[in-house]
Amino acid sequence: MSFPQLGYQYIRPLYPPERPGAAGGGGGGSSAGGRSGPGAGASELAASGSLSNVLSSVYGAPYAAAAAAAAAAQGYGAFLPYATELPIFPQLGAQYELKDSPGVQHPATAAAFPHPHPAFYPYGQYQFGDPSRPKNATRESTSTLKAWLNEHRKNPYPTKGEKIMLAIITKMTLTQVSTWFANARRRLKKENKMTWAPRSRTDEEGNAYGSEREEEDEEEDEEESKRELEMEEEELAGEEEDTGGEGLADDDEDEEIDLENLDSAAAGSELTLAGAAHRNGDFGLGPISDCKTSDSDDSSEGLEDRPLSVLSLAPPPPPVARAPASPPSPPSSLDPCAPAPAPSSALQKPKIWSLAETATSPDNPRRSPPGAGGSPPGAAVAPPTLQLSPAAAAAAAAAHRLVSAPLGKFPAWTNRPFPGPPAGPRPHPLSMLGSAPQHLLGLPGAAGHPAAAAAAYARPAEPESGTDRCSALEVEKKLLKTAFQPVPRRPQNHLDAALVLSALSSS
């Protein structure tokens, strides 16, 4: 009997010389047990001591007596396998012992093999019974693979699970199984025994399974597609060379033309602005047509010149209806205005008469502008609607005397928190100018001439000549000087102005 898993190809009688009759005793016991019964076999085994020797060698000294007694009592000696070869097991030793254990082998085995042989180690590199060892394909393993191939002639492509199953059955590796099936398919293809539809060149494992003709056809298709792509790229490149360059040049020319037009337009506008500034001089007294673009600048810069209280409380001034552009007047008409000295901000940016400036103007300014005696020449230019009757002026003065607060200046504009106007025709809103003190406007003769005061506050809508325009500007200049006097710190001033503005906005 052989034990290939342990490297023993044949068995030689390796018994110790001090027990030459152990094999005979064991054989007799087995034969007697076979003929007379289990009791006789057990008694003979126990008498000869072969079973005790076996058990002592297998289980160790402490368990030898108990094991022998149990075996003799139960009569298991006749049913032990290989009863004639029981003494050989001690020399084999335990299968899972460490390979360096000294007492595993029998002394006779040590005498026969003086040096340790690698085949005796249970954990060698390639044991004969190791299933992970690469095994050559034999007729038995290939017969199993051929049987599977015959059953699957229409689809000789085993899946991953089927390959694993076949590798376990045939004790081969997955690579060997896959290679065998690939070779079998190739052989059948050469023999014209294909009974399956050819697959693509690559399967799940990346192996080439398609036919050679299919591979050639696919290569030709790939080459044709590459050629077509190259031809398309060449055509596109040629079109770009033919038309793209001209189109780009045209675009560049258009862009250059546009840029030139823009530059010329910008230069023209700059020239016109420079010419207008040169014509107007340093005072900005040009015609209205030249000042269209400066209206927004005047409004924005005028806000900077006003005090903080005016900016926070004043509503936006009403739009003034301007007359259509008139032809520029000759420069000789500007001569009366030229020698008049005035700050540049007041001359360049004439402001419209606003309610906020009047409301926040001081009642007793420190000084009045010199040279304001008498009615200005612009009083005659006032429209006829501003001509006020003396009765209306007297009524406004009486209403003003009733209220001691500065809000009494506006009796006809606010009818809710203040006493209303007297019975009769409603006076004009500018009637308060007649009853206002003289120092309010900065004009000594303004109290006696309400029409002149109204004309001073109302900007002329359409000046007839350069002299009238200059006189109106002089009046406005004087008014601006008085309006921007430092306001004395009185707690009622801001409150009064806020009340007036809120009443005006609600009415």
Curated annotation (Swiss-Prot):
| Extent of the signal sequence | none
Q: State the GO CC annotations.
A: axon; cytoplasm; nucleus
> What happens biologically when this protein's gene is inactivated, per the record?
Mice are viable and fertile but display a significant reduction of body weight, primarily through the loss of fat mass and increase in basal metabolic rate with browning of white adipose tissue.
Is the keyword Repressor assigned to this protein? yes
Which GO biological-process labels does this protein carry?
Answer: atrioventricular bundle cell differentiation; energy homeostasis; His-Purkinje system cell differentiation; kidney development; mesoderm development; metanephros development; negative regulation of neuron differentiation; negative regulation of transcription by RNA polymerase II
Location of the DNA-binding region in this protein: 130-192
Compositional bias, Pro residues, is annotated for 314-342, 418-428
Gene3D superfamilies named among the record's database cross-references: Homeodomain-like
Which parts of the sequence are annotated with region: Disordered? 19-39, 193-398, 416-468
Please list the residues that carry the modification Phosphoserine: 326, 329
Q: Does the keyword Repressor apply?
A: yes
Q: Which GO terms describe its molecular function?
A: DNA-binding transcription activator activity, RNA polymerase II-specific; DNA-binding transcription repressor activity, RNA polymerase II-specific; RNA polymerase II cis-regulatory region sequence-specific DNA binding
The UniProt regions of compositional bias labelled Low complexity, in chain numbering, are 436-460
SUPFAM superfamilies the UniProt entry points to: Homeodomain-like (SSF46689)
Pfam families noted in UniProt: Homeobox_KN
The similarity comment for this entry is: Belongs to the TALE/IRO homeobox family.
The family database entries (PANTHER family) matched by this protein are listed as: IROQUOIS-CLASS HOMEODOMAIN PROTEIN IRX, IROQUOIS-CLASS HOMEODOMAIN PROTEIN IRX-3
Which purpose does this protein serve, as stated in its record?
Transcription factor involved in SHH-dependent neural patterning. Together with NKX2-2 and NKX6-1 acts to restrict the generation of motor neurons to the appropriate region of the neural tube. Belongs to the class I proteins of neuronal progenitor factors, which are repressed by SHH signals. Involved in the transcriptional repression of MNX1 in non-motor neuron cells. Acts as a regulator of energy metabolism.
Name of the featured protein: Iroquois-class homeodomain protein IRX-3
Q: Which organism is it from?
A: Mus musculus
Q: What is the lineage of its organism?
A: Eukaryota, Metazoa, Chordata, Craniata, Vertebrata
